Amino acid sequence: MEDIQIQAKEARSVRVYKDGVVTEYEAGTENFRRILAAWEEMTSDAFQMPAFGVSIDALTREERKKGTWLEFVFDKERGGELPFERLLVACIPEYRGFNLIRYTQGGYNGRCYYLDLREKDMHTLCDCLEHL
């Protein structure tokens, strides 16, 4: 399977949630390019790890109302053995790794992907999202 951090380039849009308020940026727009550049900088040396986290739809939707979240939206299902139509990430600047929560078949249910950022953290991405 293609690395999950590379698949972000295939998204048709990204959604940014700030305290529950969502803004969507379509592929090809300036803000989409900014987000993708920050994502690529952050994940350039990342290592995909086995999934430890499990998402429960109702809890994820409730948590998404707090703080800043980024969601990649795809035209078709991707991911093979862990399929997804969207990938949701909680943006917390000091995190050095994070779950990518899979949305499939109408909900955020099941195992997550995990990216270890190695020596990096999420500051670059969080700063980008803060200044859109």
Predicted regions and their residues:
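Function-determining sites in protein domains
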Residues: M1-L132
